[in-house]
């Protein structure tokens, strides 16, 4: 079915920054998509177009990207008469209209909004749920569907929070649950226990939450954060059912070839900065003490040697985010260098749905896992909930069980699990190989 109208407007994300919303009209109705944005962004990502006009929105306006949709993409797209069910044709058209390697002419935020809205229109035309359409596009198995383990970001540090803590995200993964609904209940109970423990130990304001809904107390070290989480798991009565994931976002504290765990202090002691192997030793010591099953971005985005050295001995899931930025060329290099064994999939890093699906397929083909991810600047759009089920990846990270822009995705997964009934399995301990279940 052809598109009769494409329209974009500027709306706001969960941090109060402007972002792009696209509406695409067919005979079936109006289909909408809102594009997210990240706080720690990789240098190899597709370009998110911002206006740069400091007199409005601190330079973060998206009026240029919106104008590109309304004045450039919309007339050309409607005229081209593309069938929305042919996602590859939709995305190839958008990519060629832009004509740059990193989508910098029209903006990845303009292109992605149209790409995702088209997939919603296609699902409606086929009279199927979005996850079913996405499964068709990715040629994924649908009997049964796989519901993901939620990696819930319950404690924030790094660029997402104040305090001296260098590592960015401490996540709980309820792998011992039998269903997604049970996993979310367990996660929620641990989160509430963590909140009250945090207030008790660090004062009432320590219960305030960061960008992704996790608590952000004034913690100095990773051990202190992990002890707090382990205590919360025990207090909630869920010992043994929950594993821990870390997102170190270490590109943020990589300076002059070393890692500065005191990077928020402008006068940090250079003699205490760590080499790649020293940081690897720190991770190994944490893995011995705590039930850690996944570490994301343990090293900086171009420190390939440190990644490959650590991966040989890690023995747990190592997730590439800043390293690969959902970019097929970077993924191929990471596979070849044996730097990691899981991809963090963020649709806005590459800028179209087709390229995102291809990135997941390339990763699966190499025996990697795939973790579908939100961004820190999120919206009420629930697309990634359907995507994780459609792609059958078995794992998702979309913040804490708090803040509506995070819960929007988790609640959508509850609905999908309920709708699928017996045709759904929960990934559980097999989260790394959801595609094989």
Swiss-Prot record:
The active site is at residues 212, 346. Pfam families: Enolase_C, Enolase_N. Keywords: Cytoplasm, Glycolysis, Isopeptide bond, Lyase, Magnesium, Metal-binding, Phosphoprotein, Ubl conjugation. It comes from the Eukaryota. Substrate binds at residues 160, 169, 296, 321, 373-376, 397. Its cofactor is Mg(2+). There is a cross-link at residues 60, 243, 358 (Glycyl lysine isopeptide (Lys-Gly) (interchain with G-Cter in ubiquitin)). The modification Phosphoserine is found at residues 119, 138, 188. GO terms for molecular function: magnesium ion binding; melatonin binding; phosphopyruvate hydratase activity. The keyword Transit peptide does not apply. Its EC number is 4.2.1.11. GO terms for biological process: glycolytic process; regulation of vacuole fusion, non-autophagic. InterPro entries: Enolase (IPR000941), Enolase-like_C_sf (IPR036849), Enolase-like_N (IPR029017), Enolase_C (IPR020810), Enolase_CS (IPR020809), Enolase_N (IPR020811). NCBIfam families: eno. Homodimer. Present with 76700 molecules/cell in log phase SD medium. This is Enolase 1. It comes from Saccharomyces cerevisiae (strain ATCC 204508 / S288c). The gene is ENO1.
